[in-house]
Amino acid sequence: MGLPWYRVHTVVLNDPGRLLSVHIMHTALVAGWAGSMALYELAVFDPSDPVLDPMWRQGMFVIPFMTRLGITNSWGGWNITGGTITNPGLWSYEGVAGAHIVFSGLCFLAAIWHWVYWDLEIFCDERTGKPSLDLPKIFGIHLFLSGVACFGFGAFHVTGLYGPGIWVSDPYGLTGKVQPVNPAWGVEGFDPFVPGGIASHHIAAGTLGILAGLFHLSVRPPQRLYKGLRMGNIETVLSSSIAAVFFAAFVVAGTMWYGSATTPIELFGPTRYQWDQGYFQQEIYRRVSAGLAENPSLSEVWSKIPEKLAFYDYIGNNPAKGGLFRAGSMDNGDGIAVGWLGHPVFRNKEGRELFVRRMPTFFETFPVVLVDGDGIVRADVPFRRAESKYSVEQVGVTVEFYGGELNGVSYSDPATVKKYARRAQLGEIFELDRATLKSDGVFRSSPRGWFTFGHASFALLFFFGHIWHGARTLFRDVFAGIDPDLDAQVEFGAFQKLGDPTTKRQAV
């Protein structure tokens, strides 16, 4: 059969056995990819520094998804939080990967079996003796089973009733761990950052799915609706399935990019909006202000700022800084973070504290400008020295570090001050190892950026697929040139023109 590549799927249009086979094979491919990718990531993942070299800096894609569902241990003896363990149990990262690969193999064999034994009695319509599928009934079965799975996940896995719970953290991504979550049945359950909403929404949606499934199993669709929506046509199923998938893809692209309880920053990295709004910077200053009320020593107060919090406040961790087509992990870009140098405080010769204006997300270069507490420009690194009035040399800017590796160290040399002012544009200053991975110094995006781009792109593609196949199934007769009200048998190709009133007719 000489079908063009874009028409090959028509071979399963009227072949329920082989339609089932290709879907099982698709599941085998998906599960096989997931398991294989997990094993690859585990082979290259370095769990030694969860603070400065977390999974998202290393470009891990499937490990974060396993972790958010409660997997934290490895058969290699390490824990995702940096500890060591002696008994990881079956459901470790490797255990989950292996389960996917075994499942993939079983699906592969099942797909082959169903391809060979395609002509099963179950697919045969006893009235006509031809292969057919009761699509509304199948819809009810799938809705019921997915409802059971959805309810079970929310009621048992997430709540810890029978399962580990999910990854839960504080708003600043510092204290994350896997724990049971109680359903949030109040209005707070609609807050996308409240983990309890995950449990309650799965329980509610699962209950609805179970009831809807039972309804579709026990109630047949009216004939007019059945015909109007082409419920007997498999392409209707394809069209509506694509709609469900692209809708879900758009939703998860949003929850990933803008952030939610389902996409913790400890697993996927911070969002770009946290940089844009100075989210972590505000929390750091709040902690410093609170600390100064009890202890007047800036060094001691800044030394208590968690290195993890300081690291979030660095532009290199902003997923919007890396180009979409720059391959590689964040570590391949600006390097592996080794340590926090400390917080630089700039002052002019009058002792006034100055703040470096931070680089906005979509700038590659940005002028070095230092402002005072009122936002008035007091110093800069000029483009043209001849016209400068606020240069570091003229204003006499110095820098002193508090906290971190350079705690208590100060510099007055203009070249050194300018170096740290440039680096302060990018947030908190870190020592970065670019030699180990031969990092090129060009920022990369995090898995948060890749996931969003991939799902938004495929959602758009699938949206057009839904329109295409929906139109094909709704207007199939029109596209084929057949009048839906035709009551006469016409021999196609034998007459001059289809629909010509002079054409001979033969009663059906």
UniProtKB/Swiss-Prot annotation:
Going by the UniProt record, its keywords in alphabetical order are: Chlorophyll, Chloroplast, Chromophore, Membrane, Photosynthesis, Photosystem II, Plastid, Thylakoid, Transmembrane, Transmembrane helix
Question: What is an example of a Pfam family matching this protein?
Answer: PSII
Signal peptide bounds: none
Matching InterPro entries: PS_antenna-like, PS_II_antenna-like_sf, PSII_PsbB
- Transmembrane stretches in the record are 21-36, 101-115, 140-156, 203-218, 237-252, 457-472
Q: Which cell locations does it reside in?
A: Plastid, Chloroplast thylakoid membrane
Q: Name one GO molecular function term.
A: electron transporter, transferring electrons within the cyclic electron transport pathway of photosynthesis activity
Q: How is the cofactor bound?
A: Binds multiple chlorophylls. PSII binds additional chlorophylls, carotenoids and specific lipids.
Primary location group:
plastid
Mind naming one GO cellular-component term on file for this protein? photosystem II
Q: Provide the GO biological process annotations.
A: photosynthetic electron transport in photosystem II
The record describes its membrane topology as: Multi-pass membrane protein
- Would you say which domain of life the source belongs to? Eukaryota
Q: What is the recorded function of this protein according to its Swiss-Prot or TrEMBL entry?
A: One of the components of the core complex of photosystem II (PSII). It binds chlorophyll and helps catalyze the primary light-induced photochemical processes of PSII. PSII is a light-driven water:plastoquinone oxidoreductase, using light energy to abstract electrons from H(2)O, generating O(2) and a proton gradient subsequently used for ATP formation.
Subunit comment: PSII is composed of 1 copy each of membrane proteins PsbA, PsbB, PsbC, PsbD, PsbE, PsbF, PsbH, PsbI, PsbJ, PsbK, PsbL, PsbM, PsbT, PsbX, PsbY, PsbZ, Psb30/Ycf12, at least 3 peripheral proteins of the oxygen-evolving complex and a large number of cofactors. It forms dimeric complexes.
Which NCBIfam families does this entry report, sorted A to Z?
PS_II_CP47
Family per UniProt? Belongs to the PsbB/PsbC family. PsbB subfamily.
Q: What is this protein called?
A: Photosystem II CP47 reaction center protein
Species for this entry: Aethionema cordifolium (Lebanon stonecress)
* Encoding gene per record: psbB
